Every structure is written in structure tokens, then in C-alpha cells.
Amino acid sequence: MYRFCAHAYLLLKYEKYHNQNQQLKKLWASFRCLFRLAAFALPRRYQSFFEAELILKNSTLETRLTLYRRLRSRLRLKNKNYTRSSSIMFNIQTTFPPHGEMKTFIVLREVDLLLLSLEFMNVSLARADLLVRNLHYFAIHSTLVMLHQYEYIYLMLTSGFCRYLGVCFFMIIQKYVTPGVMLGRWKVTA
């Protein structure tokens, strides 16, 4: 599953599907199906990430904040002896597109990406501290890639660090800007 997603991401990354709407729809359907199946196939320690995904899909701010606090509390309990765990948080941003409809999406900070990956992989606290202090070596970036307006797409956050741990991260991002615009940058390893 992850191998397929990595391949699909690379195709999207190099804009092969930008002008092929039919193929993009098929690719999106594949991502959606894989993500739904993964939620049932992964061990329990991975479920926190799928709760984070639910924050995006809930319509009310109150529900999103409730799920967010539950996820943050779980991560704090798991890393209760690690001082940086208290800084884990999702940056929930609300934007207003030209047509006035409110859109909400989540941007993960670099430290959050690192700590979440450590939580998923059960890395020891000593190792976690070492990786946090050397964060800049791994070049983890929170990136929004805009392919088409007002559509959802699952993106794999790829970096040298994620490849090192063998972890694939997915985010749902609701786009509201001009298609093809890239914010931030991706570091894709071979």
C-alpha cells in the first residue's frame, strides 16, 4: 500500500496529472480507498493519526477542538517524561476563499511531525531527544501542494527522516488557491 502511495505521490509531484482530470479522479479514488482500509489494518498505536484526520472532516469547530485535545492528551501521556511533548499541537487554520465559504485545514509544524513520527514508531526517549536536537538535518517541511481548486487529496509527507523511519504520513488538505501553486518545499529521497 505504501509503495503504491509513494509512486502515486511522485507522479503528482512532477505535475504529470495536472491537466488530466479523469486520471486525477481515479488516483484520488485510489488514495481514498487505501486510507479507509489502512485505518482498520494498522495497529492501535497508529490510530491517533486517523483521529487527527477526523478533525478536518468534522463540520463544527467544537468537535474539531475536542478531537484535537484528545489526541494531544494521548501523546502527552505516552511521552510524559519528555519535556517537549507538551508543545505538541496542531495549527488549525481557517481561511476564507473568494466565494466566502469557510474552509479549515491543518498544518503540522516541523517539531510536531517529528514527535508524531516518534510516537508512531515507539522510538526511545533518548533517541527522540537526539533527533529533536538535530531536527534541521532531516529537513522536514509542512507543505501544501495545490493541484485543483476545492478538492481534497491525500499527500504523503516525504523526507529523509520519514524514509529513515519507514513512515508515510498522509494529510487531507482542502485547497482554496490557484491550482498548481506550491507552498514550502518537498525533499524527496530516491
Swiss-Prot record:
Its main location: membrane. The keyword Transport does not apply. One of its GO terms (cellular component) is membrane. The keyword Transmembrane applies. It is found in: Membrane. It comes from the Eukaryota. Disruption phenotype: Deletion causes a vacuolar protein sorting defect. One of its GO terms (biological process) is protein targeting to vacuole. Signal peptide: none annotated. It is a single-pass membrane protein. The chain crosses the membrane at residues 152-174. Keywords: Membrane, Transmembrane, Transmembrane helix. Partially overlaps RGP1. Disruption phenotypes caused by deletion of this gene may also be a result of a defect in its overlapping gene. This is Putative uncharacterized protein VPS61. It comes from Saccharomyces cerevisiae (strain ATCC 204508 / S288c).
